Amino acid sequence: MAVYTDITEDELRNFLTQYDVGSLTSYKGIAEGVENSNFLLHTTKDPLILTLYEKRVEKNDLPFFLGLMQHLAAKGLSCPLPLPRKDGELLGELSGRPAALISFLEGMWLRKPEAKHCREVGKALAAMHLASEGFEIKRPNALSVDGWKVLWDKSEERADEVEKGLREEIRPEIDYLAAHWPKDLPAGVIHADLFQDNVFFLGDELSGLIDFYFACNDLLAYDVSICLNAWCFEKDGAYNVTKGKALLEGYQSVRPLSEAELEALPLLSRGSALRFFLTRLYDWLTTPAGALVVKKDPLEYLRKLRFHRTIANVAEYGLAGE
């Protein structure tokens, strides 16, 4: 469910007068996504996406998100482009919410990606990292090491309701990662949420990246580790080394990882698995019964975390010769 704020046709038509987008012919809510309210608009010019930013999105972060999409599109990356109003502003207001019009991106996300798709994802992620160079607005990653501690403090007391022994396992893991987290690897703007539903394909060709609302400044290789976790495990929890090899080789073909980044990848992958475990755990424990939100299983990412603990070097992810 991704329409938290309803809008009327009259409100929408009035909102659109602030833009040079033609006249509204139809609109409908989009069910996918969990953070914002999204609508697909058809106009006499082009199809558009209307996004109303809900309370979980900080209004002060919106210039970063919208500006980043503009910057990336100007650099040639295929991603949604925020449309300016007639007064030049990117952000408006509708139904009491900050709102923006975004260009419509053709494509669909893949339910069953193959290794060839993972290779394209690696290439696109590296292209995004390179294209983001020169983007001057900064946004720290609130879901890095310090954020993990905050999430765990909120969840620790009830964690064993999800699986017995979690309290004994997770606190030492956070402490270990905090003590060993790399500080001097290449950094820049990362997507931070490049899951399957945020990558569009037309056939086997990647048509674009979407949903930059977790983007922030952090280690570039950390973004690679997020993709390993999101794209390279099967439904039964097994790591698919063929997909991992393809994703890493695709990335390296555009932006080669340094020796230090490759060496850090198992640790970074533990960290990114922990990050999604903790946010899922918090949501699992705090989402009210009957809420129109599908709760995601935190234990999926606990199993990935445990897998990464067994990895001695990046060759085990599929990169031969490392």
From Swiss-Prot:
Pathway: Amino-acid biosynthesis; L-threonine biosynthesis; L-threonine from L-aspartate: step 4/5
Key word Transferase present: yes
The reaction(s) this protein catalyses: L-homoserine + ATP = O-phospho-L-homoserine + ADP + H(+)
Any one Gene Ontology BP term: threonine biosynthetic process
HAMAP family found in the cross-reference section: Homoser_kinase_2 (MF_00301)
Family statement drawn from the similarity comment of this UniProt entry: Belongs to the pseudomonas-type ThrB family.
Protein name: Homoserine kinase
Organism the protein comes from: Agrobacterium fabrum (strain C58 / ATCC 33970)
Gene: thrB
